[in-house]
Amino acid sequence: MEDTTFLEGANLAGITTLMNNLHINEQANLEELEKQVMGKQQSFPTDHFDEELNGLAKSLGINFNDPEFSLDAAHSVISKKPSGRGSDKVHGGIRRDSVCTDSICSDSVCSGSIRSGSIRSGSIRDGSIRDGSIRSGNIRDGSVRSSKTRRGPARNSSSRNDRGYSLSTHRKKYAESEASQKTAISKRDRKNHYAESEYSEKSIKPSTKQVDRLINHLRSNGDPNSFYKKEHDYERKTKLVKLEKINMLLTYLGNEQISTDDIKIPTIDSSMQEIDDVIEMLTLRNVGIRYSSIAEEILIGLARGLEIVFDGTREIPFLNYRPDYTGLHNTFMIKLFKMRYETSQVVGNLVQNMSPLSKICLELGPSLLLYPALIRTKHKASEDLYNLLQKGPEDPFTAYNEIHETLKKNNK
């Protein structure tokens, strides 16, 4: 049989070093007690249940290994062989055929004809029946009728009320329990199920992880002060890294001329929660501006495309309509500037699960579409201004108005 014990006390290694000795008896040896607890073996509850069940059966005089409790045992009251001179004598002073014969039901003890109180202690002497009979008063009607005992509903109903335990009923219950055990979970499966349910992996809180690290450190070094020093150094390094991230975000926002005066900058002495809150606020402010810029560039690029396709010279098929979208990007710029928060939210929901490479492509993609249009507008404005200056109008006010109109037209 496989060993099902496990060492639960091994998880308490080093626990005595964490205990406060102020309220502990000075004569107590904590190290010795720890060794005793760690070396103690603990069994499964199923084994403890089996031990209690066997002890209870022993106190009641029940032996589960007795053939009497098997389904194949003969239908007799006493299954043990009689000890004595002959086979007619029975164990304990009762003859085998004197109690359960053909005239009396073999499935019960004296059903109907012998009551539970008819045979009393002391009525059978010397372990045998004198003169082959039982004295009067011990059995009602003076004797047991052979081959003439009536078997009917009345006798059977009276046997149910007898205080004597019917072995046929016991065999029936035992057979039902045997059948139910075949469909039940085996003992090994119950133990495995118990182990998996009790010791399944659960979510570990940070405080639990810290306790585990402390116990592992005590097992290796045994000095709790050095562990706390390492924990303090680790927390300090984490704060320095996060403070550097805050400085980088402040630099980015300063280059974009975004104010951060309302945010209190933490120091190395600030708590970790305060530092995390500042990082979250600066990150939201930074990505909000970036995401709104991405949305503006994409929508303005689409407006530029409509201006190129529908400039008033092309006709839409089947509609006989020539739309002119020249200068649409200026209208888009004004509208999008008022909706920077909404556009940043839309882009933020789209890019939150994107990889860094995809974000870079999304940032540079609209610029590839807008750059040719910007260069073309710049060259056209320079050419118009150069031609106007070469013309040299006589009236300076007329020249100024023409230059102003040319620049205004090219900026559309």
Curated annotation (Swiss-Prot):
Highest taxon in the source lineage: Viruses
Compositional bias of kind Basic and acidic residues: 192-209
Bias (Low complexity): 116-126
Keyword terms: Late protein, Repeat
Keyword Iron among record annotations: no
UniProt entry tagged with the keyword Transferase: no
Factors inducing expression: Expressed in the late phase of the viral replicative cycle.
Region of interest called 7 X 5 AA tandem repeats of G-[NS]-[IV]-R-[DS], as start-end residue ranges on this chain: 112-146
Region of interest (Disordered), residue spans: 116-209
Residues that span the membrane, as ranges: none
The Sequence repeat ranges on this chain: 112-116, 117-121, 122-126, 127-131, 132-136, 137-141, 142-146
The family this protein is said to belong to: Belongs to the asfivirus B407L family.
Protein name in UniProt: Uncharacterized protein B407L
Taxonomy of the source species: Viruses, Varidnaviria, Bamfordvirae, Nucleocytoviricota, Pokkesviricetes
